[in-house]
Structure formats: structure tokens, C-alpha cells
Amino acid sequence: TKPGFAANAGQDAIAILNEAVAGAALVIAVGACASFGGLPKAFSPLPGSSSPSGAQSVNDLMKAGRVPSKTLINVPGCPPIPEVMSGVLVYYLVNGTAPALDSNLRPKQFYGETVHDECPRHDYYEDDLFALTFDDDGARKGYCLLKLGCRGPKSHNACTQIRWNHGASYPMSSGH
């Protein structure tokens, strides 16, 4: 982060992170911003320019030598799923090691499959039945949302397994 963009009680965010990481056995980057830089990293006012905030993920900071390198587990999401966060912590406490990770340093147990693989609308995808607007007959029948911008075939998350609000729902169930 650039100076002045992230501070708490007068202390720079990088200094706070360095202090926390110094004695850590491993680091868990929780949330989209910590895991991958989130929207602050993605935002760029002009094509080809960098983020005005200088936002970086914890992994970026470790690779740049701005934070000590430790075993890193990314738990992305905005918001991340609480059961995933606690599952990673419990796994470490029970086993004394990080769980198996994918190429993006996410726990395979929770991020190994695509959202598309477990989507309740997947059969409609296979049958080539798609909603074309959020209020058409296809949407009301629960057809696949791929043509409306769904990124399920490329998204890895545990939302289809765990869901939010004690298993009550998640985006595909509510038509998003």
C-alpha cells in the first residue's frame, strides 16, 4: 500500500502486518483483499495504469520482501464464508500443518471445485437452457445464469457446499 492509504492509530498497515507475521507459524489471508488485493488492487482509473492505492495481496507483499515469507493460506471471499475460516484454523490446530492448497494457495477442501460443478442449475446448463433476463420465464424456472454473467465455471468457492446464513442460501439459489 502507498503511504497514507492504510493506517490504524497512526501505524502503517505494512508495519502492523509485519508485527503480526513476525511470530506467526503460518499466515492466513482472510478475504478477497488480503488474498488477492480485491477491488482496490483491480481498480485502475486509466488503461495501463496501476491502482492509485498501491493495494497488494499478502502474497504480493511476501514476494516483494515487504513482509516476512511464511506458509500462506488464502481464504478469499467478500465476505469469506465463516465455516471456511474456522475449518482452516481447526485443520491447522488438529494437524499442525496447513491443509492441501491449490495453485492460488487456497485450501483444496473448500476451493477445489468450481461453483459450476455443484450448482443446482448445472443440469439446465447441460440441457442448454439459460435465463436471458433476471425476470424471464427461464429465470423463474431456475435455468442456468451463464448468459447473464455467471462466472461459476471459473469461480472456485465453497458456497455451493456450505452456503451462507447457516446453510440457508447463496447467490445461485436466490437467482444471482
Describe each model-derived feature in a short phrase:
Residues 1-163, 169-171:
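Iron-sulfur-associated redox domains of electron-transfer enzymes in respiratory
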Residues 173-176:
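Short, intrinsically disordered, charge-balanced linker/junction segments flanking boundaries
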